[in-house]
């Protein structure tokens, strides 16, 4: 089986490295500088000391990345629709499975990644890949667990069998929507935890994570209906596991971003964002989650507080007052 990974950021490259031990992998990027750097050094600047094996073929033209059995989309959520249209223009075969490895909510439509893909590529089978997984640890082939969500059980079992390795434990789920809600919101809550980090102790930090779970459940319930909420999703690796690691580890880009915003000495969140080199998915998701909560008429005070901090320049003091009370 040939697997294509679209997106050569830290996460996409880490996935390619992780899967390349026993498989041929295509790694696609539209960034010529990244393409040339990886081709020359066989290493990503974002993943130092993590060599990229010869089993990984790096491509610059997307047409060269569609001849695969499985395509893993590890692109920023706000670029997902555009990439899917490019795949459609390449006459992507209908039997090619799409695995989503991106997290967030599309700002312009308030749709989850699977909803975007189903609009543009309705004939391709779809799965979602999510869980607690820092790119650097994945690239170093350290042990980790993930959830693969797929509504087609036969396809899901086949993908789990193909992707699971000695250091990767995959759990199969059919809860495509719930997994994505958890994956998107945890980045917003990580920013919130970064804001309070250093100002208060571990007790307040734990309370904030606990309240975050309540907001995840609220949006999850609004999307699927109260009777369809799966407790295994909420307590599994893709929700509780991912939330805990993203909200507590300094390797978390969103947590670090929240801390920088809280200690910015007057710089706006947009200024801090522009100075960084990494994608902060929680920044975009904060607005999308706030807008979606308004649309669905549910209360999400943590998301609202982070949205107002990032987009309306609410003071840190007022934001923290909401987060800790």
Swiss-Prot record:
Descriptive protein name: Glycerol-3-phosphate dehydrogenase [NAD(P)+]
Keywords: Cytoplasm, Lipid biosynthesis, Lipid metabolism, NAD, NADP, Nucleotide-binding, Oxidoreductase, Phospholipid biosynthesis, Phospholipid metabolism
Function statement: Catalyzes the reduction of the glycolytic intermediate dihydroxyacetone phosphate (DHAP) to sn-glycerol 3-phosphate (G3P), the key precursor for phospholipid synthesis.
Disulfide linkage: none
Pathway: Membrane lipid metabolism; glycerophospholipid metabolism
Domain of life: Bacteria
Keyword Disulfide bond applies: no
Catalysed transformations (reactions): sn-glycerol 3-phosphate + NAD(+) = dihydroxyacetone phosphate + NADH + H(+); sn-glycerol 3-phosphate + NADP(+) = dihydroxyacetone phosphate + NADPH + H(+)
Annotated EC: 1.1.1.94
GO biological process terms on file: carbohydrate metabolic process; glycerol-3-phosphate biosynthetic process; glycerol-3-phosphate catabolic process; glycerophospholipid metabolic process; phospholipid biosynthetic process
Positions annotated as active site in the UniProt record: 186 (proton acceptor)
Compartments, as annotated in UniProt: Cytoplasm
Family annotation (PROSITE patterns): NAD_G3PDH (PS00957)
GO CC annotation, single: cytosol
HAMAP family on file: NAD_Glyc3P_dehydrog
Residues given in the record as sn-glycerol 3-phosphate binding sites: 103, 131, 133, 186, 242, 252-254
Family: Belongs to the NAD-dependent glycerol-3-phosphate dehydrogenase family.
GO terms of molecular function: glycerol-3-phosphate dehydrogenase [NAD(P)+] activity; NAD binding
Binding residues annotated for NADPH, in chain numbering: 11, 30, 103, 135, 253, 279, 281
InterPro entries: 6-PGluconate_DH-like_C_sf, 6PGD_dom2, G3P_DH_NAD-dep, G3P_DH_NAD-dep_C, G3P_DH_NAD-dep_N, NAD(P)-bd_dom_sf
């Amino acid at each position: 089986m040939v697997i294509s990974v679209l997106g050569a950021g830290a996460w996409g490259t880490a996935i390619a490295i992780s899967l390349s031990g026993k498989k041929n992998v295509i790694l696609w990027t539209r960034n010529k500088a990244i393409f040339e750097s990886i081709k020359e050094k066989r290493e990503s600047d974002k993943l130092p000391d993590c060599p990229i094996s010869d089993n990984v073929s790096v491509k610059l033209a997307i047409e060269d990345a569609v001849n695969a059995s499985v395509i893993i989309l590890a692109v920023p959520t706000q670029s997902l629709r555009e990439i899917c249209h490019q795949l459609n223009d390449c006459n992507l075969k209908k039997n090619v499975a799409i695995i989503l490895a991106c997290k967030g909510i599309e700002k312009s439509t308030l749709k989850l990644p699977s909803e975007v893909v189903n609009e543009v590529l309705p004939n391709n089978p779809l799965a979602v890949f999510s869980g607690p997984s820092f790119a650097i640890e994945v690239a170093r082939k350290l042990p980790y667990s993930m959830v693969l969500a797929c509504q087609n059980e036969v396809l899901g079992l086949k993908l789990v069998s193909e992707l699971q390795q000695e250091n990767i434990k995959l759990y199969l789920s059919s809860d495509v929507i719930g997994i994505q809600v958890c994956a998107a919101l945890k980045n917003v809550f990580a920013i919130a935890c970064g804001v309070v980090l250093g100002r208060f102790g571990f007790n307040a930090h734990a309370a904030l994570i606990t309240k975050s779970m309540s907001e995840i459940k609220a949006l999850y319930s609004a999307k699927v209906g109260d009777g369809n909420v799966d407790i295994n999703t909420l307590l599994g690796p893709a929700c509780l596991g991912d939330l805990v690691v993203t909200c507590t580890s300094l390797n978390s880009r969103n947590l670090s971003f929240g801390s920088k915003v809280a200690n910015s000495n007057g710089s706006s969140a947009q200024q801090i964002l522009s100075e960084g080199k990494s994608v902060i998915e929680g920044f975009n998701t904060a607005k999308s989650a706030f807008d979606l909560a308004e649309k669905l008429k549910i209360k999400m005070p943590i998301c609202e507080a982070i949205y107002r901090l990032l987009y309306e320049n609410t003071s840190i003091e007022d934001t923290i007052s909401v987060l800790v009370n």
